[in-house]
Amino acid sequence: MIQQALLSVSDKTGIVDFARALHGAGVKLLSTGGTAKLLAESGLPVTEVADYTGFPEMLDGRVKTLHPKVHGGILARRDLPEHMAALSQHGIPTIDLLVVNLYPFQQTVAKDECTLADAIENIDIGGPTMLRSAAKNHRDVTVIVDPADYATVLAEMQANGNTVGYDTNFMLAKKVFAHTAQYDGAITNYLTSLGQDKSHSTRSQYPQTLNLAFEQVQEMRYGENPHQSAAFYRDLKAVDGALANYAQLQGKELSYNNIADADAAWECVKSFDPAKGAACVIIKHANPCGVAIGGTAQEAYEKAFKTDSTSAFGGIIAFNVPLDEAAAQVVAKQFVEVLIAPSFSAGARTVFAAKQNVRLLEIPLGKGVNAYDFKRVGGGLLVQSPDAKNVQSAELRVVTKRHPTPKEMDDLLFAWRVAKFVKSNAIVFCGGGMTLGVGAGQMSRVDSARIASIKAQNAGLMLSGSAVASDAFFPFRDGLDVVVDAGASCVIQPGGSVRDDEVIAAADERNVAMIFTGTRHFRH
């Protein structure tokens, strides 16, 4: 039974109402510093920990709760007579409920003006110590680190005579250890990112020790293949608009491959500004098999589908605008695994209600960019900044005698945007705001060029006057010759080959406009 609670919080959201409810249930309140002041000002009877222990706060508040009367009351096992006898001998009451959250270390070090001294002063000592003590003794002590759990604990207390059950205490204890692990990980990340001069301004993006925190979203029936086990975890620092923030509106449980392909689709479609029109991306095996823009979601989908209707079967489809009923009726004619949009109209929901196997994912658009991209290798982890660079007009360099027309320039920029999301080696034919042929993942760039032109031919799409994007430079003129032979009139590529002059001369020879971006977009 909860008879005495200690409350000491940095995040004071809801703490007064929670404390008032505890007081109403007959629970004695202990507190520290600012929390005690707030509770007292709110008319609640509260005992300062310094008065409770008979030992004042000292060292500018560094020592407040590190006292046997606090930790003894938390750690004593109620089922061990010798523990309870020790408490009685020393006049220590039990503390049955602990509510603590920690100094805002991560928020502090995120500030540009933060100094090492600021960071050090925001390393909480007493808070984690109490939390770990209470979580260790969770059979007897209820511990709360998250204000979102106040209502759960109060409801259980009210239903069970001020008692919280073991299952709830165990759940809360797990949250505590996860929280303190993340807290210590953030401290380690920060301290090991500092340079020799310990200056905040010279912090490395890549600390010597990297601690990451993820929480499980689901265990899966299997992984990439049926003989592999799998689970999906969400980054605790997932940015706005990240796939991991999806809300599934209907459909079967997402598979490992569904999530991998959905991420590719969502990242690609997010690169198109919805203010400039609707965009649709169709993904198969992590590669775009159709991308298009249009005046409406329906138009964008119909154009994207034309690129490769065969590969689109059973694909993942993403939109950068809300999906309305008109678009839904057209998409519903196709077998689709996952459909993603910022929102779905009531009419669209009704259309897909008859197709309950289709997974609908709603993800609000966001401009956040993940801090890191990861790739696991044997015994290690490759870490890099995300490929978030968008080429600016000032960076574009026309290297041929002929300049692209305004229409060609629009097609080139569209093709370049798509090529970034195609597995290397990538060649993409585009025209009229849609992909016409995609060559992906070949060991030879010239083979990717051939495949892209063949795919367009198979789809009955004309490549005459089309634009081509290559994710990396053409090492020889042969790749350029293949795309021009297929009908391309203009090309966009990074440049940077030792044979750039040869490729430029070939473009001039064939009256093709070519642009260098100076940026490569390898994708593996």
UniProtKB/Swiss-Prot annotation:
GO terms for biological process: 'de novo' IMP biosynthetic process. InterPro entries: AICAR_Tfase_dup_dom_sf, Cytidine_deaminase-like, MGS-like_dom, MGS-like_dom_sf, PurH-like. GO terms for molecular function: IMP cyclohydrolase activity; phosphoribosylaminoimidazolecarboxamide formyltransferase activity. Pathway: Purine metabolism; IMP biosynthesis via de novo pathway; 5-formamido-1-(5-phospho-D-ribosyl)imidazole-4-carboxamide from 5-amino-1-(5-phospho-D-ribosyl)imidazole-4-carboxamide (10-formyl THF route): step 1/1; Purine metabolism; IMP biosynthesis via de novo pathway; IMP from 5-formamido-1-(5-phospho-D-ribosyl)imidazole-4-carboxamide: step 1/1. It catalyses: (6R)-10-formyltetrahydrofolate + 5-amino-1-(5-phospho-beta-D-ribosyl)imidazole-4-carboxamide = 5-formamido-1-(5-phospho-D-ribosyl)imidazole-4-carboxamide + (6S)-5,6,7,8-tetrahydrofolate; IMP + H2O = 5-formamido-1-(5-phospho-D-ribosyl)imidazole-4-carboxamide. Pfam families: AICARFT_IMPCHas, MGS. Keywords: Hydrolase, Multifunctional enzyme, Purine biosynthesis, Transferase. GO terms for cellular component: cytosol. NCBIfam families: PRK00881.1 (NF002049), purH (TIGR00355). Belongs to the PurH family. The IMP cyclohydrolase activity resides in the N-terminal region. This is Bifunctional purine biosynthesis protein PurH. It comes from Ralstonia nicotianae (strain ATCC BAA-1114 / GMI1000). The lineage of its organism: Bacteria, Pseudomonadati, Pseudomonadota, Betaproteobacteria, Burkholderiales.
